């Protein structure tokens, strides 16, 4: 149904300010030197390395297939979902509009603020009042792995903070959907 575009490292905003991703945070915890290398790429001091890792390519494709199967499942159950096109410039605004409209699920939600950016796999509407109405949203990250890693928790926590800025209330839960189950944190 949809092919994911990867925005994994920091970038510059139109105002020449560096915007970080959840991956940058996780990478920095594991290797501060990688942060410096990525910074040099953003500043134009180094070329972005080209990755030809076929194993990672296969895993990425399997992940996309898993997300697509979840979308098909949602559609078969009659849920109203909204897909954000990652190639659109106004993905953040479309995400906020979908939240205000009360879509049951939002796929590839563009979440960003002045310092952080990312694409949440899914947002799910829940029965918790917010400035959106009688509902609010929580993040769902899809993972093929049966174990949740620290980087995943950092990612969904960061996305939850950005969601709170939009809806005026911090999500009660964060979720990770695996092929076997949905884990709620």
Q: What does each model-identified segment do?
A:
Residues 2-5, 183-185:
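Short, intrinsically disordered, charge-balanced linker/junction segments flanking boundaries
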Residues 7-132:
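Metal-dependent nuclease catalytic cores that hydrolyze phosphodiester bonds in DNA/RNA
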Residues 111-185:
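Nucleic-acid nuclease catalytic cores
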């Amino acid at each position: 149904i949809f092919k994911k575009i990867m925005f994994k490292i920091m970038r510059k905003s139109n105002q020449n300010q560096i915007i970080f991703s959840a991956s940058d945070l996780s990478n920095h915890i594991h290797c501060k030197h990688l942060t410096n290398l990525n910074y040099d790429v953003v500043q134009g001091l180094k070329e972005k390395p080209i990755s030809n890792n076929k194993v990672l390519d296969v895993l990425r494709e399997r992940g996309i297939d898993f997300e697509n199967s979840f979308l098909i499942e949602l559609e078969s159950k009659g849920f109203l979902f909204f897909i954000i096109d990652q190639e659109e410039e106004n993905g953040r605004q479309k995400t906020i509009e979908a939240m205000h409209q009360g879509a049951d699920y939002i796929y590839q939600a563009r979440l960003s603020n002045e310092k952080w950016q990312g694409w949440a796999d899914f947002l799910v509407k829940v029965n918790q009042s917010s400035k959106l109405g009688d509902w609010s949203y929580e993040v769902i990250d899809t993972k093929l792995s049966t174990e949740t890693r620290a980087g995943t928790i950092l990612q969904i926590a960061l996305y939850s903070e950005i969601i709170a800025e939009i809806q005026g209330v911090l999500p009660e839960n964060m979720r990770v959907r695996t092929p076997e189950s949905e884990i709620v944190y």
